[in-house]
Amino acid sequence: FRVAVAILGISMAVLACRVPVKGSGAMTTDLQIDAQLGESRWPREAEATRSIADLIARTIEERYPADNRPARRDAHPKAHGCVRARFTVEDTLPENLAQGVFVPGRSYKAWIRFSNGDSDPERPDVLGDARGMAIKLMGVPGAKLLPEESTDETQDFIMINHPVFFIDDPRDYLTLIKRGSSTNPLVKLLAPFALGLKGAMIARAITKKQIVNPLHTRFWSMVPYRLGDDARKQAIKFSARPCVAHANNNIPKDPDPNYLRKAMANTLSTGDACFDFMVQPRRSETMKVEDSKTEWRESEAPFIKVATIHIPKQVFDTDAQMDFCENLSFT
């Protein structure tokens, strides 16, 4: 049961979509709570957030000492590759969705990184794991929330191949990573108990997942994000789904340890790939913004296609492009 190491760190990117308030330090944990969108503050949330960030930083430093650099990501360190793409917004959209980056008809250059979630970058792909899809749109104008990215013209979307996350309370997450990073084997064994029964079941489902090809896999944001700043602002989740369903879901026999990269390379050596990018607007107060362990049912809140992701035929697995991939960051 690899919960403590399989997806550590990802919740720093996907826990509640807060708006940081400008502070004096490089990182601020002051949070603006938007009750209109269903947000509420967890007890000791700011303190837990600071502790989580500090502990993750220490864990990376310990995992990658000076003689073992460069350091990798704390989670999703194994990249299958970064591919060039084009993100094109639909020509017509409902008024409540036609805001932010979703300007009808607009097209963005993009980079997409596909990955495994486990902290071991050498772990064979055939073993169950969370699989990541991180999209970086280029040429996006407008103010950014993070002070260190205030002049960047980018927009990131971070997803994994599961619709929900295994934890929501930052205090429980802090307990999880403290136990998971402990050098005491007995303490490490206690890590899953920080999740509770429902969280443990979700974590087990996530870390057992096997896939045939990242380009044939659906991905979800797991948690809500805010779309818009004015009276039309709303909480949404998002998802990327292959434009065409693929019938072959059989894991290859005796696969190469990096067979997911090879599968992507084979697909893009002969043709293009495509995803529908969709958003799921929050429809009612029963869809809890702070509950990342409960899925918003599509029967109650259908996903709406807002853009098409076109990945052209290409060679992406060169040493130079893999190095470029390692240097991309997603927030």
Q: How would you describe each model-predicted region?
A:
Residues 21-331:
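Active-site-adjacent core segments of small-molecule enzymes
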Residues 4-13:
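Bacterial N-terminal signal peptides
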